[in-house]
Amino acid sequence: TEALIGKFTSEFQLGAPSADVLWISSVPVSLRKEGYLAQYHSSEIAAIPKSVLEVFNKPNGYWYPGIMVLYVIGVNTKHVPMAEAPKSWKDLTDPRFKDKIIYADPNFSGDVLRVISTIGTKLHNWDFYKKFAANNPMIVRGHGQVQTFLESGERPIAGEQGHQRLLNSKNKGNPIETVWPEEGIIVSPWSFAISKKAPHPNAARLLI
């Protein structure tokens, strides 16, 4: 997400935009404030429940709900039986899980930033990550790599992963299970937004 936004804003500033529509793992409030987004009121918005619009920070035509990714804990049960698996986010700090956890890099994922912020400020506090770091989690660039290491068993616990990836993997026959953390899951809203300099604005509106 961060790399994509950087490319989008650079092209916008240079006057050579290649994108009509952004599809990102965040709610693009700052992009709206900085003048990058076009406002478009689609009639389809009436079909979206108000409760969903609240989650997406009342977009007012500047972005539209896409999906909501449910972040949970993933376990390779061939290497960590469910009876021994973490039951909560807090359990990820337990020393018995040292050298077993895989985690995506927040420098490349807006979703991971949301997970870290939620755990550090709402579910627990920032001391959580000091204890978590002591467990030597492996940090990889993205969630695709998280899934690869999880499935291979090299790192049998995904410290955060989208539920759909875990479910898809399980349905393919992999020994992957989902842990629904006791403190609650973390939801990341993905949004559509139209560039104010969209090369094909009518096509962008049609997509939205």
Residue ranges and their predicted role:
Residues 182-187:
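Short, surface-exposed loop/turn microsegments at beta-strand edges and helix-strand junctions
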Residues 12, 123, 169:
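Active-site catalytic pocket residues across diverse enzymes, especially alpha/beta-hydrolases
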Residues 72-79, 117, 188-203:
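A bilobed periplasmic-binding-protein/Venus flytrap-type ligand-binding module shared by bacterial periplasmic
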Residues 87-96, 190-208:
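Bilobed periplasmic-binding protein/Venus flytrap-like ligand-binding cleft at the lobe interface
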Residues 1-9, 17-154:
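Extracytoplasmic ligand-binding site segments that recognize negatively charged/polar headgroups
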Residues 39-43, 176-181:
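Short hydrophobic/aromatic-enriched beta-strand-loop microsegments
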Residues 28-31, 156-175:
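A ligand-binding cleft/hinge motif common to bilobed small-molecule-binding domains
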